[in-house]
From Swiss-Prot:
Its EC number is 3.1.27.-. The active site is at residues 38, 150. It comes from Mus musculus. Disulfide bonds join 47-106, 61-118, 79-133, 86-94. Substrate binds at residues 33, 62-66. Residues 1-25 form the signal peptide. GO terms for cellular component: cytoplasm. This is Eosinophil cationic protein 1. The gene is Ear1.
Amino acid sequence: MGPKLLESRLCLLLLLGLVLMLASCLGQTPSQKFAIQHINNNTNLQCNVEMMRINRARRTCKGLNTFLHTSFANAVGVCGNPSGLCSDKRSQNCHNSSSRVHITVCNITSRATNYTQCRYQSRRSLEYYTVACDPRTPQDSPMYPVVPVHLDGTF
């Protein structure tokens, strides 16, 4: 009885470890990645600081990134607007915002071998934006059935 109990506990421990390992491999959902890369309510953000955070996850310097100064909930609301053709000319899940928001565009000015050393310039403006939306994943909040997953452009 002793060896079987030890064996079953070991199997349970291995199974728990496997579940935890799989959960950590799942990483961010597409909507979480969208929020991290494009939603920032700070209209005075510093591109060098914010892009270092994004580049850390990528392990390389991103050349261009647009931050929308709005909430994730407002971006989700855009998913309720009529859908249309995305800039890739294939996808039909793009939605235009009905109001303009402040944006900051960070454009790389100095690319470095080490992603922490890249430098950016900022351009601020007030623009409409287009997001691609998909049904939420099981890891996303059930609060929103459809979520933004890609910033398709500004205009």
